[in-house]
Amino acid sequence: MDNNSQNIDKLKQEFIANASHELKTPVTSIQLAVETAITALENSELEDTRKFLNQILIDSQRMTLLLSDLLDLSQLEVNDPIKELVNLKNIVEAEIRFLPEENKNRVNFESVDIDFLIDPDDFSMIVRNLLRNACNYSEKNKKIDVNLFFDNSDVVLTILDRGRGISKADQERIFERFYRVDKGRSRALGGTGIGLSIVKHAVERNNGNIQVKSNLGEGSEFIVKFFNT
């Protein structure tokens, strides 16, 4: 087996381990929280019950994000894109509305109405993962700028965060499946290391490309371009 194959196998093993851990941890936490909440209800400890129910909600959200990544990846690998003429501005606005309230208020979105031939599920997937990435890797009080515009007949989507930035070495690998820039932080956020590879796959199969511009300490800008050919 060559080095490249060994590296891929190692990354796959890491992903399986990470995914298993991320699924097992919230399930265990949910079970414990439910048991404790039941006991607290029996003892009329309402404040404790509120805290445990909140933990159930958080862990359920983590599981949902992980399963969403796995389902997105499966969809991209199994199904061919089904392109439709859709309004891209409406799709971006919908994905912003789906964000948690504290993140929704951080996003500045500017766009004209753009009708474009693309797989709408793929485009939603792209926007959703890039928004999640920007929210996760920037401070909670920092704004995120999202722009959607025409470049002649092509379409460009940019998402700019003001986070910690990405090193030049990591920029060369961030779109690789299973690769994580900061494994410790990704685990704390419930990440699996496949979000940006999902984005790249979805972009390229819709006749587009993606690049990142970033300096450490200065945030990151992801630039997606779809070609009208």
Tell what function each PLM region has.
Residues 134-135:
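Short helix-loop "hinge" at the ATP-lid/N-box region of the Bergerat-fold HATPase_c
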Residues 77-82, 115-118:
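Conserved micro-motifs of the catalytic ATP-binding
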